[in-house]
Amino acid sequence: MTIMRKNHPLLKIINHSFIDLPTPSNISSWWNFGSLLGICLMIQILTGLFLAMHYTSDTATAFSSVAHICRDVNYGWLIRYLHANGASMFFICLFIHVGRGIYYGSYMLSETWNIGIILFLTTMATAFVGYVLPWGQMSFWGATVITNLLSAIPYIGNTLVEWIWGGFSVDKATLTRFFAFHFILPFIIAALVLVHLLFIHETGSXNPSGLNSDSDKIPFHPYYTIKDLLGILLLLMXLTILVLFFPDILGDPDNFTPANPLNTPAHIKPXWYFLFAYAILRSIPNKLGGVLALILSILILAAFPLLNCSKQHGLAYRPITQTLFWIFIANLLILTWIGGQPVEYPFTTIGQMASILYFTIIIILMPIANMIENNILKMH
């Protein structure tokens, strides 16, 4: 008699995904971040559900309801800060996951990669609408500035902005619909995650060597379940330290002030995980140009499979592209720093240089490095 998990209609799906899944024997800890993202999503949905039980999406009471959650609800402060800092951990894992995909050439599994880009965009949208909900100063002005960017779209821009706002400014209607979006989007993300997993299990994972690993596979359980468990413990430890010791370190001080349409904060900036894109947006003096650069800064990820002309899979044995990759990461950190700085010299100039380098590395330098490395291989 075969084991139940292998022939039960429901259990065999779980079995083929998490138990008997053939996995390359040499995947490193950089492959842990997929499961960590799954844990982050579960934490966000659970804490978000409990927050939604006490939150009111009305301009008159939203700010007070968040204060009420922190002061009067049992462990409300913990749930609120787990949710806020959980988003930061989510994005840290997301950036590392995408970075690993770029480094090890996972983008050649194009369906998985493209679903991943859609997931990235959906997560960014979820985080943006969620940032507006506490209805602090930066929530309000962040929503105003970012949604107002859509007015740069020719002909339909202004109508589109008013349609999203539900009026002539960010107000009660905007907050209500943003709450609705923030509630539904994580479930859409969860559905997309299943599609993402479906495609990755069609082809199997890539591995650090970039070679075909069909001849050297091991079952996912117990080897990688234990390995993932260690990653999860480390993630939870870091999140706990963040929540209990530095809960507001990644937030904005302006969000302790209730939203006031008559008073603009000195420097409007989004949450830290959007700063790199915000810096690219600000580095172009033209509104429409800035919006296009902002969109392109994420969609450029879709160009990786098209621009890749290397004979090797991944960067493990490609020192020139490796160097470019780490310059790209350093440049991304510089953009993140610039996004949080005021719009003045020398920050504007640094931002413009970093923005140009961001696109130049991906579109021009990496393909050139690929060709040079191909020629070096031919010589030997």
Curated annotation (Swiss-Prot):
Q: Does the keyword Iron apply?
A: yes
Q: Which SUPFAM superfamilies match?
A: a domain/subunit of cytochrome bc1 complex (Ubiquinol-cytochrome c reductase), Transmembrane di-heme cytochromes
What GO terms are given for molecular function?
metal ion binding; ubiquinol-cytochrome-c reductase activity
Entry binding sites for a ubiquinone: 201
Amino acids binding heme b b562: 83, 182
Which CDD domains did the record assign? cytochrome_b_C (cd00290), Cytochrome_b_N (cd00284)
One GO BP on record is:
mitochondrial electron transport, ubiquinol to cytochrome c
One Pfam family hit: Cytochrome_B
UniProt KW keywords: Electron transport, Heme, Iron, Membrane, Metal-binding, Mitochondrion, Mitochondrion inner membrane, Respiratory chain, Transmembrane, Transmembrane helix, Transport, Ubiquinone
Cofactor(s), names only, from the UniProt record: heme b
Sites binding heme b b566 sit at 97, 196
Q: Which GO terms describe its cellular component?
A: mitochondrial inner membrane; respiratory chain complex III
Q: Gene3D superfamilies from the xrefs?
A: Cytochrome Bc1 Complex, Chain C
Subcellular localization(s) per the UniProt record:
Mitochondrion inner membrane
Positions in coiled-coil regions: none
Describe the function of this protein.
Component of the ubiquinol-cytochrome c reductase complex (complex III or cytochrome b-c1 complex) that is part of the mitochondrial respiratory chain. The b-c1 complex mediates electron transfer from ubiquinol to cytochrome c. Contributes to the generation of a proton gradient across the mitochondrial membrane that is then used for ATP synthesis.
Q: Could you say which protein family the record assigns here?
A: Belongs to the cytochrome b family.
Q: What else is known?
A: Heme 1 (or BL or b562) is low-potential and absorbs at about 562 nm, and heme 2 (or BH or b566) is high-potential and absorbs at about 566 nm.
Oligomeric state and interaction partners are given as: The cytochrome bc1 complex contains 11 subunits: 3 respiratory subunits (MT-CYB, CYC1 and UQCRFS1), 2 core proteins (UQCRC1 and UQCRC2) and 6 low-molecular weight proteins (UQCRH/QCR6, UQCRB/QCR7, UQCRQ/QCR8, UQCR10/QCR9, UQCR11/QCR10 and a cleavage product of UQCRFS1). This cytochrome bc1 complex then forms a dimer.
Name-wise, this protein is: Cytochrome b
Organism this protein belongs to: Blarinomys breviceps (Brazilian shrew mouse)
